[in-house]
UniProtKB/Swiss-Prot annotation:
Catalyzes the conversion of 1-hydroxy-2-methyl-2-(E)-butenyl 4-diphosphate (HMBPP) into a mixture of isopentenyl diphosphate (IPP) and dimethylallyl diphosphate (DMAPP). Acts in the terminal step of the DOXP/MEP pathway for isoprenoid precursor biosynthesis. It comes from the Bacteria. Belongs to the IspH family. Dimethylallyl diphosphate binds at H41, H74, H124, S225, S226, N227, S269. The keyword Iron-sulfur applies. GO terms for molecular function: 4 iron, 4 sulfur cluster binding; 4-hydroxy-3-methylbut-2-enyl diphosphate reductase activity; metal ion binding. It catalyses: isopentenyl diphosphate + 2 oxidized [2Fe-2S]-[ferredoxin] + H2O = (2E)-4-hydroxy-3-methylbut-2-enyl diphosphate + 2 reduced [2Fe-2S]-[ferredoxin] + 2 H(+); dimethylallyl diphosphate + 2 oxidized [2Fe-2S]-[ferredoxin] + H2O = (2E)-4-hydroxy-3-methylbut-2-enyl diphosphate + 2 reduced [2Fe-2S]-[ferredoxin] + 2 H(+). GO terms for biological process: dimethylallyl diphosphate biosynthetic process; isopentenyl diphosphate biosynthetic process, methylerythritol 4-phosphate pathway; terpenoid biosynthetic process. This is 4-hydroxy-3-methylbut-2-enyl diphosphate reductase.
Amino acid sequence: MNILLANPRGFCAGVDRAISIVERALELFSPPIYVRHEVVHNRYVVQNLKDRGAVFVEELDQVPDESIVIFSAHGVSQAVRHEAKRRGLKVFDATCPLVTKVHLQVARASRKGIECILIGHAGHPEVEGTMGQYDNPAGGVHLVESPEDVANLVVKDPDNLCFVTQTTLSMDDTTDVIASLQSKYPSIEGPRKDDICYATQNRQDAVRNVAEKVELFIVVGSKNSSNSNRLRELAQKKGTTAFLVDNADDVDPSWFNGIQHVAVTAGASAPEVLVKQVVDAIAKMAPSVITEVEGRLEDTVFAVPAELR
């Protein structure tokens, strides 16, 4: 069997930074260290940090006053920040810097009274945090997921609009929705191209590059990982059978009946150790040749807060 490993795959700079923030806080301060929401959407990573003394909560009312709390890579609303300050919580912010860029755009629109449209998935913590940057009743913030949502959208002033996107969506994910917005609202302002999350786009490009060369695609990532699900969907759109697995235990040998070529990748929140375990499990099924497929080099590094260095 030929096993192709897509590149780049796995941890991005934002995930590396978020995990490092929790690890350094655990080293420098006595547990418990509270983390609002899963710091990244991966079961293995979260369990590892729990075992070391991190306590994951969904709301700040689960955190004792004057405790240390870390905001997840997905970001939080302004209301959450205000509550943390009011209660005297010591905050370390693990929000991905690329998410923060989107937050600043929404906050700027709010200050200017420009209505803002967010392209994203309802219920995702990043979406909730981004929409929570807007607090100007003179304008408004709207969430759309599809061209149909755009068709049904009603705004106050069609000539005073901007849009932003959830960072775990690539340009390809949002093309149709953006086209619908620009068709309906010709004067709408969008983000600059350099605001696109490089990691999301690179991992999707890597899947696209490999998908047509294999009969089966395995994506390593947790079910609540938005970007991992997008990778699986992209492989399927290319006509390749694809499965999302948390770890090697999820790999079903029946998937490989008659398969000669399989590809493996990992979402941005999945560690390489899980990829290795999955590849090892596949290689045990038949004599295998493992090939690293060349891809775009990533050298972005995001620094942790100065107090944790």
